[in-house]
Amino acid sequence: MLQWLLGLFTSSASKAASRPVDQDVAAEPPPPPFLRRESMLDNHQQVAAYVFSVETPAAMQAHAWQVSTRKFFDSVLINHFVSDKLAEVLDKRLAFLPLSPAGLEHPALDKLPRENLVIEFDPPPGAEFDRTAVLARLIALHDSGFRLGCGHALAEQGLPEALEIAQFISLGDVTNQSPPDLLARCRLLATRYPESRMVARNIDSIELYQACQQMGIHLFQGRFLTHRGARSGSKIATYRMVVIDLLNAIKRQADFDELAGIAWRDPTLAYRLLRFVNSAAMGLREKIDRLKTAMVYVGRDELYRWLTLLLFSSKKPDHLDNALRENALVRAKLAEQLAAGRMPPRERDEAFVVGILSVIDALLEMPMQEALAQLSLPAAVAEALLHRQGKYAPYLMLAIACEESDQATIKSLADELGMDAFMVNQRHIEALTWAMSFSEALEESHLGE
């Protein structure tokens, strides 16, 4: 099944030529799209959902392309979830699947799991569609066990009945709405649809996220997580400074006695490192009690990778940092996967570290240059993080583009690496499922706390 799905993303001319052409289009179908992923947080600052999309390129929005292109793109998006691989997301998070009217009718929807999958219908202003047919289809999907998400504007678009069966109601782009208007809309929707959960989109700052929390909104999507602004007078916590000192000591080849001594400056950190080495994932036959022995067993490279993750830990639980860590893990694993076959193992490890450290400015709430000044990093790593240049930059930029950019940008970056949508999407899905499983293991074992 997975191989069949991945076949949808091959870009060979022979496959394109063999596809039937829709009657309303006389040109070649669009190239297979790249999968985009965006995090959605809840009121507890935890990653509650992912939104998956394969948007229609702007250049293909002419009338002759609209219906058939949207149908094709929706088909690709739906077939991602037919795959057992991406279906793993539904074991751990909600997944929002935005569809057009044509996508709502796709026969493969019947094969999708109902648990944690949200079918979303939120047409843009002025969109034309058969309201009677769409409402009938939404009711049928609801009755078959799917959760539904609908745009609040459907009430003004002649489809208020859809909101009555929706578990989620999207408020749209909240950055374009004044606080009084947004608050009034939230109160109205909460009164009319008390069982529904409201979703805010395109939140671009932590301040807007916090303001939306006060308005009774339940789910939050936007770049606020990875684009937290620098805070005046921001200081690095003592615990994190010990981690940074350890990272720098590893890079200057300090011996293991010195590394253990640095770690014991914070007993909590030393305990976490011992707990990591003795965890089931390491497969030890006998427990290791001495920190130096544990460090020798793990080795410098693996210890360095683990310590970069411990930067996201704190003395008391911080769900926002945990959410940021999961995002960093996806970036890191995707950058590493993209570099596979193109770089030797040591450089792939550094590509992983580049992905982790790409959010250190948001984590420490200070400019990237100031944050990186604390670390002794290889020049190529610093160059990628500060200037998006050097050998690691293309892998980092493509990993970030898969969560933030449009199709044209993702394709341009993929072309630089000689990769098509099939290859990038495959690695993206693998990185996401790995990151979620890894985050879950951290939380269950308390290793990341």
Predicted regions and their residues:
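C-di-GMP signaling machinery
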Residues: 1-32, 60-84, 228-256, 265, ...
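Bacterial c-di-GMP phosphodiesterase EAL domain
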Residues: 10, 16-115, 123-126, 133, ...
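Acidic active-site catalytic centers that drive phospho-/nucleotidyl reactions
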Residues: 42, 151-152, 266
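Soluble or luminal CAZymes and related metallo-dependent hydrolases
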Residues: 73, 181, 327
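Hydrophobic, Leu/Ile/Phe/Ala-enriched alpha-helical segments that form helix-helix packing faces
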Residues: 76-85, 138-142, 189-193, 339
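A conditional alpha-helix N-cap/helix-loop micro-motif detector
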Residues: 100-101, 131, 179, 252
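The catalytic core of metal-dependent phosphodiesterases that act on cyclic dinucleotides
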Residues: 111-226, 347-350
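Conserved alpha-helical "signature site"
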Residues: 186-187, 194-196, 201-449
